[in-house]
Amino acid sequence: GTVYVFLLLLAFGIFTDISNACSEQMDDEDSYEVEKRGNACIEVCLQHTGNPAECDKPCDK
C-alpha cells in the first residue's frame, strides 16, 4: 500500500512540475506578445503624432 501511495505522489509531483513549466512558458510567450504589440502600437502612434509622450498612454506603456 505504501509503495503505491509513494508512486502516486511521485507521479503527481512530476505532473505538477511539467504543468508548472508549461504554464511558465505560456506566461513568457504572453508577455512577449504584449510587449511586441505595445512596441508596434508606439511605432504606429509615432508615425501619426511624432510625439512619444502622447503614445505612452494609449499604448499602455
Swiss-Prot record:
This is Potassium channel toxin kappa-KTx 2.8. GO terms for cellular component: extracellular region. Residues 1-21 form the signal peptide. It comes from Heterometrus petersii (Asian forest scorpion). Disulfide bonds join C41-C59, C45-C55. GO terms for molecular function: potassium channel regulator activity; toxin activity. Keywords: Cleavage on pair of basic residues, Disulfide bond, Ion channel impairing toxin, Neurotoxin, Potassium channel impairing toxin, Secreted, Signal, Toxin, Voltage-gated potassium channel impairing toxin. Expressed by the venom gland. Negative results: does not show activity on ion channels KCa2.3/KCNN3, TRPV1, and KCa1.1/KCNMA1. Voltage-gated potassium channel inhibitor (Kv) that acts on Kv1.3/KCNA3 and Kv7.1/KCNQ1. 1 uM of the toxin inhibits Kv1.3/KCNA3 currents by 35.1%, whereas 10 uM of the toxin inhibits Kv7.1/KCNQ1 currents by 44.9%. The keyword Signal applies. Its main location: secreted. Residues 22-35 form a propeptide. Belongs to the short scorpion toxin superfamily. Potassium channel inhibitor kappa-KTx family. Kappa-KTx 2 subfamily. It is found in: Secreted. Has the structural arrangement of two alpha-helices stabilized by disulfide bonds (CSalpha/alpha 2(S-S)).
